[in-house]
Amino acid sequence: MLRNISLKMDYTKTREIDDYLKHVLKPQRYIHSLGVVEMAGDLASIYGSDVKKARFAGLVHDIAKCFSCETMNRLIRTYGIDLKYYNRPELAHSKVGAAMLKKDFGIDDPEILMAVSSHTAGRYGMSMLEEIVYVA
């Protein structure tokens, strides 16, 4: 069972994004994201990483998971994402999610954006935050 998760973070968009996630994600996906918030925070605490940043990245990591393949393909073109993700929503959602956070929600922290972008397939040379979200 999840502990009481406080979403009081130092990011002004957190409440707006949390409300958005509650409306667009299926309930089980939203619950999954809250679990990632908790696990990412715990791992960040253990490994000396920024707990608030890890929790925020955990919350938003699946922000684009709700889109159909057709919508994902449109967003890939809109955001200028590599076309190798076209018709591959299971991989594209991380790239689209990072682009959404930056362009639609004004999140400009490169560590958070990279953690979201790489959480599905990983990448060589991931930062501690990327590894935390990937594992969480």
Tell me what each language-model feature is:
Residues R29:
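All-alpha helical catalytic cores of prenyl diphosphate-utilizing isoprenoid enzymes
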Residues H32-S33:
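N-terminal glycine-rich anion-binding loops that anchor highly charged ligand groups
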Residues L2-I5, M9-K26:
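Generic N-terminal amphipathic, Lys/Arg-enriched alpha-helix
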Residues E16-V24, G41-A136:
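Divalent metal-dependent catalytic cores for phosphoryl transfer on phosphate-bearing substrates
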